[in-house]
Every structure is written in C-alpha cells, then in structure tokens.
C-alpha cells in the first residue's frame, strides 16, 4: 500500500527491498597490520530458519542487540527478529496476524517496536515487544491500521502512523497506553518515523496544504514545517538526535534528484553524494547529531552504505572498512547507528552465503591519544613501529590506533611518539 508520501527507504521496506538488488561490491583489502583499527569488526547476522534474506533497522546503545526483519521469498512472509549474542530470535506475530517487522529498539535492547501484518487482508497493527510478549498497541479512534517506527530510549514512547479505510494517514505518538494524533501540515497525510531520547520531540513527513511532502518536527503540541533545500521542493525527515535538535533525512525535486540532508539551527545542509552519483538518503544519526549514516548511489541500481561527519564529509563504508569485508561482500545500506556512533547496522551482500543479510559493523572505540602502544599489548616495540610505518601518510577519521595523536593523519608526529617511547613497558 502506498499513501503517496513514501519513496526511498519506505517504498523499499514495503516491497521487500527489491531496489537494493545490486550491491556496491568491493574487493577486500589485505594488509599486514589492518590500519583501520584493532577492535573493528563486521558481523553478518544471518537470517531466520526458512528465510532467505534479512534487514537490520535498529541497534541498542551497546551494540549487543539488533532488530529488523527476515524475508522468505518462497512463502513471501516477513518476520520481525531480535538478534543478541549471535542468535537471531523470531519475535512471532500478534494473534490473527501471520507476519511482522521490527523497526525500533530501546537503548538497552529490551523493547522492540514494529508492526504485525495479516498477509491475506493487508491489515497491519503496531506492536511493542518486551519480556517475550508482543503487545498490540491498537489504533486511535477512527483509524483501522497502525504501524510503529520509532521508540524512546526507555521504551515508554512509541511513534508511527495510523490509517483510515479511506487511506488517510496520520502521524501518531503512543504514551501511557494512549495514541495521540499529531495532525498534519495542512494536507491529509503524515507519518512519524523517529522520536527523541525522552520522547518529547517527533520527526517525520507530512503533506502541506499544496500537497507537497515536507519534513516536520513536532514538539510541545506544535508541528513545525522544516522546509526543504534550495532547489528541492520536498523533504523527508527520517531520524532525530537524542535531544531533538538535529534532524536527518533527504530532499527530492521534480528532476528526480535526491540528497541526504541534515537540519540544525533552522537550516538544512546538503550532505552530498558519493563519487559521481546523484542520489543519497540519510537514515540514522548519532545521539549528538554529529554522525549520519544512510545510502548513496554511485551508479543506477548500485548503492553503498555511507557515513557522514562534519570533518570527513561523506565516506563509503565499503572503502573505510574494506579490511573487514571479504571479496564480493558489500555494505549496501546503513539504516541506524548507536547513540555514540560506534555501531552501525543495515544490510548488504554476504559473499559467503550469496544473499542479502543484515549486518552489525563495530567501527571501534573513538580515537584516544596514547604513547605509541598501537597494538595495546603493554609494550611499545617493533610491531607498533611497523604499524605506523605501514600506515604512514594515511588520513581519515577512522585510522585506529596508528593515529597515535588522533589528528586524523598518520605522520611524523605519530612516528616520533612511538620512537620517543620505544621500549616502554617491555
């Protein structure tokens, strides 16, 4: 069902992700000392028994819990999953429903939200899962369907959408067992996608009085039109920072161009594209609003997961973390990021299984200056010196411990730090 508002990720979510069939495939990079950092790792989450594909849509603060959905293309059924400690759990469905999808998770991973689906009728209902029980959140008065997308850090506030038999849609907010209709920007449809940490700020999209699709930010009972980028007439807000001050999403225009965007201090910023591509979408943002993730197309039908930072701009995660990717594997999209920016989830192509799978990327702890013990074995020795020499000249925001002084460049200063402290702790 398409309510005329959703393109990009939402359309992809509804049709099973078909638009991401072609991946941004890269060859793995081997190096003696994995300059990207010692603690970085990529975990393919697999899929549920009987399912052939999986997508991750949310991650807990510590990266231990990931939620999403798995798809059986034979039976054409979806199931919500919760992954923890290497095990993917099928969350089941509500009574009377045979399918489900999970989109949001609380900070501690204990609460999961999404929707249950009746495959025969197309009926769907928002759910909140906790302590092994899937709760039907019902619908607001006058509505017959509901869908949960986002949840507050403590799991007490849920946001999403409700629809009528006439296919009108409204952004909604659930708290204390009651759904609240957030209204629209003057049109007949609105969707809520994300909520601030404390549940007080909601972002999403709405049609305005002229039927343009616009991003909104709702707070204190007021829905604010966030406008769009110059040269773009529509905007889509998908995620919000912990305090509600930073919003990310994408803008589009009649020419079919899409740009990942970031809103702060009342202004939209164009986050750019990868390579010669002309299409990017931002889907997740860190707690402080400084790190953004999403997807960008480098060619028609060929998308790559990206990360954007104020200093580094937009980077292809397939290149930044090539050392943890095997030949033929690729990170197609990044859908969410942990509050501290360390963990990124999404989906890609796992060459080992030949299928689309959810992934968990641990980018490693943020850079902390040190005395030259690159491999953290307590001794500044030949191994540390070689690590810096092999990485010498590299630049970027994710160099790992070879960037001894954390200035985003492996240079003379890092080499001198190792030499000055050579032999320490040995």
What residue spans do the PLM features occupy?
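Cellulosome-associated attachment modules in secreted, modular CAZymes
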Residues: 324, 328, 357, 364-426
């Amino acid at each position: 069902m398409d309510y005329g508002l959703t393109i990009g990720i939402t359309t992809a979510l509804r049709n099973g992700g078909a638009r991401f069939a072609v991946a941004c495939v890269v060859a793995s990079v081997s190096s003696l000392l994995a300059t990207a950092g010692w603690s970085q790792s990529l975990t393919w989450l697999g899929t549920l028994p009987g399912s052939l594909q999986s997508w991750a849509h949310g991650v807990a603060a510590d990266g231990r819990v990931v939620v999403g959905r798995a798809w059986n293309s034979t039976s054409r059924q979806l199931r919500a999953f919760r992954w923890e400690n290497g095990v993917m759990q099928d969350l089941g469905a509500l009574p009377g429903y045979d399918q489900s999808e999970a989109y949001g998770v609380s900070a501690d991973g204990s609460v999961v939200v999404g929707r249950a689906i009746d495959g025969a009728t197309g009926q769907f209902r928002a759910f909140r899962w906790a302590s092994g029980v899937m709760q039907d959140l019902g619908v607001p008065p006058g509505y017959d369907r509901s869908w949960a997308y986002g949840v507050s850090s403590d799991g007490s506030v849920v946001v999403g959408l409700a629809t009528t038999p006439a296919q009108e849609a409204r952004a909604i907010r659930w708290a204390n067992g009651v759904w609240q209709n957030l209204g629209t920007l003057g049109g007949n449809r609105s969707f809520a996608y994300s909520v601030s940490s404390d549940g007080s700020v909601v972002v999403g999209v709405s049609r305005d009085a002229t039927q343009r699709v616009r991003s909104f930010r709702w707070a204190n009972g007021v829905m604010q039109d966030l406008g769009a980028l110059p040269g773009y007439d529509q905007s889509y807000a998908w995620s919000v920072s912990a305090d509600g001050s930073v919003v990310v999403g994408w803008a589009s225009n009649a020419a079919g161009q899409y740009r990942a965007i970031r809103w702060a201090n009342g202004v939209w910023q164009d986050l750019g594209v990868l390579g010669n591509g002309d299409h990017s979408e931002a889907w997740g943002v860190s707690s402080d609003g400084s790190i953004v993730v999403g997807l960008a197309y480098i060619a028609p039908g060929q998308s790559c997961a990206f990360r954007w930072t104020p200093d580094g701009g937009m980077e292809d995660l397939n290149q930044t973390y090539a050392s943890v990717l095997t030949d033929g594997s690729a990170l197609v999209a990044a859908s969410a990021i942990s509050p501290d920016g360390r963990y990124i989830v999404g989906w890609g192509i796992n060459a080992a299984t030949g299928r689309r799978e959810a992934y968990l990327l641990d980018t490693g702890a943020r850079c902390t200056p040190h005395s030259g013990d690159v491999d953290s074995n307590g001794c500044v020795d030949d191994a540390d010196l070689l690590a810096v020499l092999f990485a010498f000249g590299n630049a970027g925001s994710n160099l790992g411990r070879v960037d001894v002084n954390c200035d985003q460049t492996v240079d003379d200063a890092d080499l001198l730090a190792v030499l000055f402290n050579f032999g320490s702790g040995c």
